Regions:
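Charged, alpha-helix-forming regions
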Residues: 1-93, 98-101, 105-173
Length: 173
């Protein structure tokens, strides 16, 4: 897989079939009715039963609407994936206006994969793959892939852009 910063977003290319399958599964993970996923995405926030009930009645529905709205944007971008040419494979364009939706959705998908595969922090340690079932090992790889996309979207990955000494000098004044 490769990625680049475009004028109006981020372009991810040469996506493998596994990457495409993972990405296409993201909306389904967010929409899961599995109680473990719902509990992870909307955890208990108050020890007091009355406060928790109030939060569930008033705040949780709004968060659910946000999940739905973000998932709609992500699904729209996924439906627009195309093969540009034979060598570049499938490409995904994430417009700047959708980056926040993608970040939130990717994070939620990672949380869902974690709980659906009954994982613990130990699965992500240096020797964690030794304790993983094959299904958990696959989930670890998918979680790392989604985290890598988040890193790109957060700007934590060098895009190979050369520094402009004039801009850098002006910024330091």
């Amino acid at each position: 897989m490769w990625f680049m910063r475009a004028a109006d977003g981020y372009l991810f290319g040469a996506l493998t079939p596994s990457c495409i399958e993972t990405l296409r599964g993201v909306p389904m993970l967010i929409e899961s009715e599995d109680e473990r996923v719902r509990a992870r995405l909307l955890p208990e926030t108050y020890e007091d039963h009355e406060s928790e009930a109030h939060w569930r009645a008033h705040a949780a529905p709004e968060l659910e609407r946000l999940f739905v709205a973000r998932t709609v944007l992500v699904r729209k971008d996924l439906m627009a994936m195309r093969q540009l040419d034979f060598d570049s494979g499938i490409v995904l364009m994430i417009p700047d206006s959708h980056v926040n939706a993608w970040l939130a959705t990717l994070n939620a998908a990672r949380l869902a994969l974690f709980v659906l595969n009954e994982m613990t922090a130990a699965h992500f340690e240096r020797k964690g793959l030794k304790i993983c079932t094959p299904k958990q090992a696959e989930a670890v790889a998918r979680i790392h892939f989604l985290a890598g996309m988040q890193e790109v979207l957060l700007g934590a990955v060098d895009h190979g852009e050369e520094e402009d000494p004039l801009t850098d000098a002006a910024a330091s004044e």
